[in-house]
């Protein structure tokens, strides 16, 4: 890949990973518009790692508090709001791990198409709009509970379908279950840590076994750009939804879905 391609794809990953607008929908656009080939496994690992670093550093205080409380809950039997939240995040991760393991090959073979991505981008955009407008939205992350956490986890598993958007599906479910916009976003972001870490380990294992050469300069640049873009995205997204809700992202998803349909059918 040339430098321009690295910059564009890393920006797309960083900006779309944590917004409810589907990163997979955006990653196929350069291929459609510019005829770019697949960026490769090593680049996917690099930009995903950059996004993972961004959410870990942004929520470092919350994650550290949760980790300490989680350890205390196991070692000393001391339970607190942070330890409960940590257990809920772990519980919410399990459905994606299970369904990802059994359905990975089917999804890669049958669902990773522009048509599927276009439809899911539109459909789940409308569901996000409904959840944002019709739900109660007054619970904090510490009021989630294990049942709601598990249901949000199933929504995350549903996001294995390309175009759904992991953050979009989890925020939609959280809003439907009564979490506030800020709480829905924060729970979704915290959920991304174990999922992204697990995915990076699995893909990294495949990469280590691959005989293909590695362009370390491109990977380093992609990681840094993805990190910066994702960090800024998280920061400003939390500010935007507190003022404007999810409507701007719903409108954007509908437009994006229409554009993808145009590429497919015109």
Swiss-Prot record:
Keywords: Antibiotic resistance, Cell inner membrane, Cell membrane, Cell shape, Cell wall biogenesis/degradation, Hydrolase, Membrane, Peptidoglycan synthesis, Transmembrane, Transmembrane helix. Its EC number is 3.6.1.27. Signal peptide: none annotated. It catalyses: di-trans,octa-cis-undecaprenyl diphosphate + H2O = di-trans,octa-cis-undecaprenyl phosphate + phosphate + H(+). GO terms for cellular component: plasma membrane. It is found in: Cell inner membrane. GO terms for biological process: cell wall organization; peptidoglycan biosynthetic process; regulation of cell shape; response to antibiotic. One of its GO terms (molecular function) is undecaprenyl-diphosphatase activity. The chain crosses the membrane at residues 1-21, 39-59, 87-107, 111-131, 149-169, 183-203, 218-238, 246-266. Catalyzes the dephosphorylation of undecaprenyl diphosphate (UPP). Confers resistance to bacitracin. PANTHER family: UNDECAPRENYL-DIPHOSPHATASE. Belongs to the UppP family. Bacitracin is thought to be involved in the inhibition of peptidoglycan synthesis by sequestering undecaprenyl diphosphate, thereby reducing the pool of lipid carrier available. This is Undecaprenyl-diphosphatase. The lineage of its organism: Bacteria, Pseudomonadati, Pseudomonadota, Gammaproteobacteria, Alteromonadales.
């Amino acid at each position: 890949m040339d430098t321009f391609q690295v910059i564009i794809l890393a920006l797309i990953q960083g900006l779309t990973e944590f917004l409810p607008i589907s990163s997979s929908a955006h990653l196929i656009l350069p291929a459609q518009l510019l005829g770019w080939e697949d960026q490769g496994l090593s680049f996917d690992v690099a930009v995903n790692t950059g996004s993972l670093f961004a959410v870990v550093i942004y929520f470092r205080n919350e994650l550290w508090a949760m980790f300490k409380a989680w350890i205390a809950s196991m070692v000393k039997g001391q339970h607190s709001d942070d330890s409960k939240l940590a257990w809920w995040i772990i519980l919410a991760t399990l459905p994606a791990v299970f369904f990802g393991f059994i359905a990975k090959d089917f999804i890669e073979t049958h669902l990773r198409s522009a048509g599927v991505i276009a439809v899911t981008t539109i459909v789940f955009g409308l569901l996000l709009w409904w959840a944002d407008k019709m739900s109660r939205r007054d619970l904090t992350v510490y009021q989630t509970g294990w049942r709601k956490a598990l249901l949000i986890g199933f929504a995350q598993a549903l996001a294995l379908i390309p175009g759904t958007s992991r953050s979009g599906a989890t925020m939609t479910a959280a809003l439907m279950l009564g979490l506030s916009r800020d709480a829905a976003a924060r729970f979704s972001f915290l959920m991304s840590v174990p999922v992204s870490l697990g995915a990076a380990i699995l893909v990294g294992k495949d990469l280590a076994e691959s005989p293909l050469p590695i362009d370390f300069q491109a990977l380093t640049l992609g990681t840094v750009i993805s990190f910066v873009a994702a960090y800024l995205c998280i920061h400003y997204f939390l500010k935007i939804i507190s003022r404007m809700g999810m409507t701007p992202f719903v409108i954007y998803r509908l437009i994006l879905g229409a554009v993808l349909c145009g590429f497919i059918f015109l």
